[in-house]
């Protein structure tokens, strides 16, 4: 215990002294492109139109009631066609995030190859379909008078953003996280979308100048049938914390675990997936690569909590992840990561140390991990 306390003090001193720049904040903003897409999904047959909902979600209800009359718009038919091809909401959100603002939306940033391939193996064909989608959405934005809608509901969207802001983590969090990983990103942005299904969300990143522009798009975090309990749907500090500490952590870990040489290393130890395969699948983690990446992100959460001086949170989430979520290899990984924390002159960033973490899986005796 004494050693752990000393290490915690060491980490706090290290990170407070090693960074001279101002604290980088977390942006919270409404994205009208994505909000408009969410409205279209509410009235599309292959979206959510045929799915009833009983929980209190005022903007979801308003979208269906106000825009039902536009269900025959071309964009709704195109959305149904794209969904049939496997190009669902998450892919369309990427398109809208990487496009200029409606009603003049056109693609500004390159889409992920995996996203394009969901439409067609022919890049020209995929590009044509995406352009048709954007042109039709531009028309919908004008015909359905979305500018008026956003003006009329400005106070609601502002209140949503303020509710998120008041639940943001420690103001030193971004600085500490970047120091721990030894890397920087251009920006970090949360995009609450009150028209989306509650608990829906996804993380995206756009290549920037010194790193990535990191985004997290998410629906309401409150699940209730009572308007008094709902507020604006985002007064949930635990969920906001998860969206920042956990999801932003992926922007540092995923680009490294996605490297071909590291994928090969990960696959070498895929026999370790067997003891926890069923419990991981219940959480949506269906393969060993995803399981390892999630282990590393959660490892970072624990260690960064120590760096922020919050050992109680570190202990709490460690217990939750190991005993309730079956991330059973965290105990081993924590022992290994100490070497990284003590030798930052040698390991300038987590990129250099992840191969060591991955190779350390070979030290694990599966007989000790019958979960």
Predicted stretch roles:
Residues 117-120, 203-238:
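Active-site scaffold of zinc-dependent metalloenzymes
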Residues 1-24:
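Bacterial Sec-dependent N-terminal signal peptides
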Residues 76-174:
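Long, mid-chain structured domain cores
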Residues 238-258:
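Active-site recognition of the HExxH zinc-binding catalytic motif
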Residues 299-371:
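Pan-zinc metallopeptidase signature
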Residues 157-218:
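Auxiliary, metal-adjacent structural segments of Zn-dependent hydrolase domains
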Residues 254-281:
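Post-HEXXH active-site segment of zinc metalloproteases
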Residues 20-109, 325-338, 342-350:
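N-terminal mature-domain "stem" immediately C-terminal to a signal peptide or N-terminal signal-anchor/transmembrane
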């Amino acid at each position: 215990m004494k050693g752990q306390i000393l290490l915690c003090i060491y980490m706090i001193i290290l990170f407070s002294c090693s960074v001279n720049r101002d604290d980088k904040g977390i942006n919270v903003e409404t994205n009208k492109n994505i909000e408009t897409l969410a409205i279209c999904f509410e009235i599309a047959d292959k979206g959510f139109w045929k799915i009833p909902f009983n929980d209190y979600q005022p903007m979801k209800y308003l979208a269906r009631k106000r825009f039902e009359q536009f269900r025959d718009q071309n964009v709704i038919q195109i959305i149904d066609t794209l969904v049939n091809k496997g190009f669902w909401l998450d892919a369309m959100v990427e398109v809208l995030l990487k496009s200029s603002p409606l009603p003049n939306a056109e693609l500004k940033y390159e889409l992920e190859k995996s996203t394009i391939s969901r439409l067609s193996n022919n890049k020209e064909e995929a590009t044509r379909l995406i352009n048709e989608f954007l042109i039709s959405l531009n028309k919908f934005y004008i015909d359905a008078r979305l500018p008026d809608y956003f003006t009329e509901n400005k106070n609601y969207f502002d209140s949503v953003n303020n509710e998120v802001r008041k639940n943001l983590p420690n103001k030193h969090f971004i600085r500490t996280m970047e120091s721990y990983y030894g890397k920087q990103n251009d920006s970090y942005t949360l995009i609450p979308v009150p028209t989306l299904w509650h608990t829906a969300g996804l993380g995206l990143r756009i290549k920037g100048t010194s790193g990535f522009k990191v985004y997290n798009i998410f629906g309401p975090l409150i699940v209730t049938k009572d308007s008094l309990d709902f507020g604006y749907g985002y007064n949930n500090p635990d969920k906001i914390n998860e969206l920042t500490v956990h999801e932003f952590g992926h922007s540092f870990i995923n680009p490294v675990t996605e490297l071909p040489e590291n994928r090969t290393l990960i696959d070498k130890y895929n026999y370790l997936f067997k003891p926890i395969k069923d419990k991981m699948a219940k959480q949506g983690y269906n393969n060993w690569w995803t399981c390892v990446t999630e282990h590393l992100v959660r490892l970072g959460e624990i260690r960064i909590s120590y760096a922020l001086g919050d050992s109680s949170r570190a202990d709490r989430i460690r217990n939750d992840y190991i005993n309730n979520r079956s991330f059973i290899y965290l105990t081993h990984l924590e022992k290994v990561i100490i070497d990284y924390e003590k030798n930052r002159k040698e390991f300038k960033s987590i990129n250099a140390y992840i191969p060591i973490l991955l190779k350390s899986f070979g030290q694990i005796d599966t007989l000790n991990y019958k979960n």
